[in-house]
Amino acid sequence: MGFINNNMNNLLDFNNYILESKSIYLLDPSTKVTLLKLDEKYHKLIEKFRTKYSAQTVENIREEYKKFMAAKENGQKYFPKLEIKNSDFDKNIYEGFGKLIDEFEDIEDKCYIAKFYLEKIHAMRARLERLKQLDEGTYEPGDNPVSKELYQQALQCVKEHPYKRPDYEKDRTNESDDVLEKIEDALDDLGYDFDVKIFSGMLPRMNVKMDLVRINKTSKFSDEDIEGLIAHEIKGHVGRFFYGKKTGLWLFAYGLHSALDYDEGLAVWNSLNLVEHPKPNIMFNISIKTCISYLMYEMDFCDLFDWLKKQAPDMSDFAAFKTCIRPRRVNKDCEILSGGPMTMYFKGYNMVKEMDDQMRDDILHYNIGPNQKYELENIKEFLKVNHFKPLK
């Protein structure tokens, strides 16, 4: 019986070998070597970009807030001028993206997924082109990238989920050390090989960078905060990076172009459905970001602040100011009618909530976005027939 089983297994292995060898997604050995080298170059360049431009903080936010409110009290308008470290155009990274585009174009006709690298690199290079134009004073905002229909959907959601002012002093009793321990336990339970460390000088209370979860030393957390952060940050963002690395390509660790829609959408869905006590204002927060993303192209900063205060009268002036500032960081000059849209939370959640469990599991494991939804089976076959090893 064992002899028959061994023969059957050998036959199945042989049949799989024949099928894989005929796959249109199979790379020739030389192209696979080239792809792996380019993937590593991509990783190093993306890290340079992320190190410089991700999680940027406004260094003079309190000073600009005081100027803004003082002008407002005098019946005047003041448009904040933001100081942001490492926000200048980086010629070396820009040229590096250009060279990488040329190299991926050389294998595009032989490598199915080269187009996904190119899509992502072109998008990141465009962000740098915008910074260059802002530095040179030649930037033109163009048409509103957010549709009026999406704005109206988000505005309706704001009305259905009004803002409730949290009682932070009452609820936030957990120190950063307590959070570190609970995050480590959650990572162990999920099998995610990530470190957790406490940092000083962070603006957010918690963020994720590569294989590291960083917690703000001075922040305090409620029990609901911790539960929500595990669902959102760990089961969402960390999970997609972790499983992306298992594919064997950095492309999937960082996420394909448009993956941020699913990334934030899944994280929000987790925050609402994988916890016993969802945090207040989740739906308000994701919908108000979309409204602001549309309106910042239609009204000036001062009018937008007033609009937000009407929608959320219980929100503190400083919280409203920060909410309006956040998408404007890319411009630095808040007099410019544009910014970096933050629609991915609302759009992404509305996509993810309509998915079945299998699709949500797929977007967790393959880190795709809506642009690649209908190519997922092709991506799976490409990874299967080319036998990539998990990244370390």
What is each of the regions a protein language model found here?
Residues I101-F221:
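Contiguous, non-catalytic segments that form substrate-binding/exosite surfaces or channel walls
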Residues G2-Q152, K392:
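N-terminal low-structure segments adjacent to metalloprotease catalytic domains
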Residues D223-G239:
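Short alpha-helix carrying the canonical HExxH Zn2+-binding catalytic motif
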Residues F68, E224, G239-D263:
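Post-HEXXH active-site segment of zinc metalloproteases
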Residues M206-L212, G239-Y243, A319-C324:
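Active-site-adjacent bridging/hinge elements
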Residues A253-M296, G348:
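Post-HExxH zinc-binding segment in Zn-dependent metallohydrolases
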Residues N281-K392:
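Conserved alpha-helical "signature site"
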Residues T138-G142, T247-L249, I282-M283:
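Short, glycine/acidic-rich hinge or "gate" loops at secondary-structure transitions
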